[in-house]
């Protein structure tokens, strides 16, 4: 595994930002400002986003704010979609979005590659009431040298996971019969996950593809043959705009 100085610097900057925002959140909790924002975050996107900035990489904070980690425009589209049907949901990449979806759907299956994060999410799911059945699965990556590869699309392109194979993870959606109304792609090996997801999408269903402005993801989305609605803009807990895309079958 190579050590890219740019990736190292990026991770350090992100860690520094997270630590700073958590320090600010701790300080605000000692004042009336945090309570003031908390009472107003339901009044509009601006208040909600300001409140969420203190919940960066904080699953409990995002659960309390009742948001997934997508752009607000995408959240609105998916929320409206879930109100139209008792949706069967599959998710790549568990987190606050798992509970958000479980509050609005008939069933949620979520696959996670990281054992520690899986345990944290499972604890939160088990502590919830008024959610649908959630099937949380662990599918860790394999070392690429130990797996016969038919397609490099299953190899992680993330710097700190280079050389790991996510075939089992991406294929988890194929272990159950039937199709899914909503498929969320917000984890590892997203191009491979999209390939599997496109074959399991219900008629009239949608795929949520997060962080879709990244070049390698744009290419995979373009080649998927699906209709694309790009939703750029503010994202809960992020200080900069991002993009989430909604993919649907052509009608």
Regions found by a protein language model. Name each.
Residues 1-66:
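Membrane-proximal basic amphipathic "stem/tether" segments
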Residues 45-85, 154-162, 167:
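Class I SAM-dependent methyltransferase Rossmann-like catalytic core
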Residues 122-177:
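S-adenosyl-L-methionine
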């Amino acid at each position: 595994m190579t050590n890219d100085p740019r990736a190292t610097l990026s991770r350090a900057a992100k860690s520094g930002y997270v630590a700073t925002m958590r320090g600010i959140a701790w300080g605000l909790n000692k004042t009336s400002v945090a309570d003031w924002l908390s009472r107003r975050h339901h009044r509009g996107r601006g208040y909600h986003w300001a409140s969420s900035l203190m919940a960066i990489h904080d699953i409990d904070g995002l659960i309390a704010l009742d948001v997934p980690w997508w752009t607000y425009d995408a959240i609105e589209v998916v929320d409206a979609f879930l109100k139209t049907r008792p949706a069967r949901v599959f998710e790549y990449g568990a987190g606050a979005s798992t509970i958000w979806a479980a509050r609005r759907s008939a069933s949620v299956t979520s696959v996670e590659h990281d054992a520690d994060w899986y345990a944290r999410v499972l604890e939160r799911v088990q502590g919830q009431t008024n959610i649908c059945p959630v099937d949380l699965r662990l599918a860790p990556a394999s070392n690429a040298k130990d797996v016969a590869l038919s397609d490099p699309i299953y190899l992680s392109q993330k710097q700190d996971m280079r050389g790991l194979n996510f075939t089992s993870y991406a294929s988890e959606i194929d272990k159950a019969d039937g199709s899914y109304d909503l498929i969320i792609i917000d984890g590892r090996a997203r191009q491979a996950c999209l390939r599997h997801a496109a074959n399991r999408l219900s008629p009239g269903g949608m795929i949520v593809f997060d962080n879709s402005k990244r070049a390698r993801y744009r290419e995979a989305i373009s080649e998927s043959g699906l209709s694309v609605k790009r939703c750029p803009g503010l994202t809960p807990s992020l200080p900069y705009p991002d993009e989430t895309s909604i993919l649907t079958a052509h009608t």
